[in-house]
Design a protein with these regions (language model features):
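Short, basic, alpha-helical segments at the C-terminal edge of helix-turn-helix-like DNA-binding modules
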Residues: 57-63
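Hydrophobic alpha-helical connector segments
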Residues: 68-96
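Amphipathic alpha-helical packing segments from all-alpha helical-bundle domains
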Residues: 110-136, 144-158, 162, 178-186
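N-terminal positioning helix adjacent to the helix-turn-helix/winged-helix DNA-binding module
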Residues: 5, 9-12, 149
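C-terminal peripheral helix-coil segments that are non-catalytic and often amphipathic
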Residues: 128, 162, 166-204
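Helix-turn-helix
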Residues: 8, 16-54
């Protein structure tokens, strides 16, 4: 279990990375943000790579909890886009990982491994959900179309932030709702939901 100081270091690093980008923040910047000495920070983390590893672990734990079978079993077709909104909320907490993922993966091997692992986990979880919805006749999509829907969802989840950054849209909530709107526009017509449910989703 990480010490309170280590957790404070990770929380401060996460804030700075999200605000300024990982590349613009040094270990000294993180120490100054916390008003501790660089030596104190070094005692807990021997450089930025270990800090990044700690943040990857935090994010992995959050996503594993969200994507575990017991959680997925509770997600019904009418809940799907709310579920995606929660995934986006988790993602926005660690949005620096999606700003320049290729650069991060090149610098930090664990990030590259984590991105691949996350995509596989999302593919598996989303595939199971859509397959169940189709079996319940709550989704009109063939197996091939379901695979493409999974690809589309993951592409938006992993790439939309970069697109928004290029358009100077850096507000986390705006980025979240843009990604969610893209998915709803493309996928909602495939779902067989009650009109009241669809109306609520469009207003959310």
């Amino acid at each position: 279990m990480a010490s309170k100081t280590a957790e404070r270091i990770l929380a401060a690093a996460l804030t700075l990375f999200n605000e300024q980008g990982e590349n613009a923040v040094t270990s000294v910047d993180i120490a100054m943000e916390l008003d501790i000495s660089p030596g104190n920070l070094y005692y807990h983390f021997k450089g930025k790579e270990q800090i990044i590893d700690g943040l990857v672990h935090w994010y992995s734990e959050a996503m594993q909890t969200l994507l575990r079978p017991a959680t997925l079993e509770k997600v019904q077709a009418e809940d799907f886009f709310y579920f995606i909104a929660i995934v986006l909320d988790k993602q926005q907490l660690f949005r620096f990982m999606y700003r320049s993922p290729a650069d991060l993966a090149e610098k930090y091997p664990k990030v590259k491994h984590w991105h691949k692992q996350q995509i596989r986990q999302l593919e598996s979880s989303l595939t199971k959900l859509l397959l169940r919805f189709a079996a319940q006749e709550a989704l009109l999509a063939s197996s091939a179309e379901q695979r493409l829907m999974v690809d589309l969802i993951i592409m938006i989840l992993t790439q939309a932030n970069q697109y928004d950054d290029l358009r100077n849209i850096d507000d986390p909530q705006a980025q979240k709702f843009h990604a969610l709107s893209l998915m709803m526009t493309a996928l909602l017509p495939r779902f067989r939901l009650q009109e009241t449910t669809v109306a609520q989703l469009r207003k959310a």
